[in-house]
Amino acid sequence: MAILAETDPVVYRLIQQELNRQRDHLEMIASENFTSPAVLAAQGSVLTNKYAEGLPGKRYYGGCEFIDEIEQLAIDRAKQLFGAAHANVQPHSGAQANFAVFLALLQPGDTIMGMDLSHGGHLTHGSPVNVSGKWFRVVHYGVHPQTERIDFDQVRDLALQHRPKLIICGYSAYPRAIDFAAFRTIADEVGAYLLADIAHIAGLVATGHHPNPVPLCDVVTTTTHKTLRGPRGGLILTRDPELGKKLDKAVFPGSQGGPLEHVIAGKAVAFGEALQPSFAQYSAQVIANAQALAGSLQRRGIRLVSGGTDNHLMLLDLRSVSAVLEKTGAADPVMTGKRADRLMGKIHITANKNTIPFDPQPPFVASGLRLGSPALTTRGLGPVEFEEIGEIIADCLFQPEEPAVLEECRQRVAQLCRRFPLYPHLG
């Protein structure tokens, strides 16, 4: 970084400030993680200089012989990691991966089914503000009002009624394991393609800690960060080589130009890391830590959507906090996601407000707080520390108007950050 400090001290200073923020805060956004120094090095390499439109061995530019080897390595490792027959490592993001699938399989006006965003779905699964909700006729399914788990009776009824061409499973705020076989049965009954978006759980899937959708779904998409702990990017997988050819064309030239080969190198490194036994241990720890945090919060009387978690994330139903604040006579007894998000920021915990199923609050206020364990697990924290974090969060939420309590919480967070340093090699 010395050359950057000399050439552009303003950008260097801002990067250092962001590094310090990451070091001094407990990162609990479920979709974030800390990638390895090796991935950082690959992304910051001379590969960023090279244009490489096309696929390995089929480029539109010369000088791609080493680029081809790197991209093919990423492809081969991705296929091995997930047991896929075909992989495309070029999508710039998970959203780009999903768009390419739509381009390959659908025509404008076709019907698609995806989970309602407020129940844990994703913008790219048919939200009206996203291109997926503008180009296609969208039918949303959700969770059961009692169990807060996927309502498969509703999914089947809607599928039979609307006959979608594509059914999407996989979510951004769903704390339970996904029954891909049940979705396959419904998709077959109505003749629909089945897409699994495993952006949040890819690392757990790759290590056998969540069922693998590749053998059951027509297409699988994912991001390469989150639980996979790679660079920010996308990935498309399929068990069908012929379908893979259509997907490749939908990526290039269908929806992208030149691939980001420095990021693809980072993906190759991350996939290689994920193939090591230590990564399977990491994934198991992610789940154990999430369950330790969930138990700690529940013991303090905080309700979790669906009653807990099977994966790396959980949703706090903050109405349970509001009920306690009202009983104790708090000046402001309403704890919303927006308010909780800001409180977490004050004590240096990074989280995000989130809607919960059947949420009475608007999305920008929300009644939920989403927490995840991947980043802090990477940092080395274990179940004991996650239980302590649960206590810190509960103290903060139940005493939001006590400056002394908030300061004590912030100091406890600072102590944890000092015990588990982040990127010490970066100076």
From Swiss-Prot:
SUPFAM superfamilies: PLP-dependent transferases. GO terms for molecular function: glycine hydroxymethyltransferase activity; pyridoxal phosphate binding. One of its GO terms (cellular component) is cytosol. Keywords: Amino-acid biosynthesis, Cytoplasm, One-carbon metabolism, Pyridoxal phosphate, Transferase. One of its GO terms (biological process) is glycine biosynthetic process from serine. The modification N6-(pyridoxal phosphate)lysine is found at residue 226. The record marks 225 as: Plays an important role in substrate specificity. The keyword Amino-acid biosynthesis applies. It comes from the Bacteria. The keyword Ion transport does not apply. Pfam families: SHMT (PF00464). Its EC number is 2.1.2.1. Pathway: One-carbon metabolism; tetrahydrofolate interconversion; Amino-acid biosynthesis; glycine biosynthesis; glycine from L-serine: step 1/1. It catalyses: (6R)-5,10-methylene-5,6,7,8-tetrahydrofolate + glycine + H2O = (6S)-5,6,7,8-tetrahydrofolate + L-serine. It is found in: Cytoplasm. Its cofactor is pyridoxal 5'-phosphate. Belongs to the SHMT family. Homodimer. HAMAP family: SHMT. This is Serine hydroxymethyltransferase. It comes from Synechococcus sp. (strain JA-2-3B'a(2-13)).
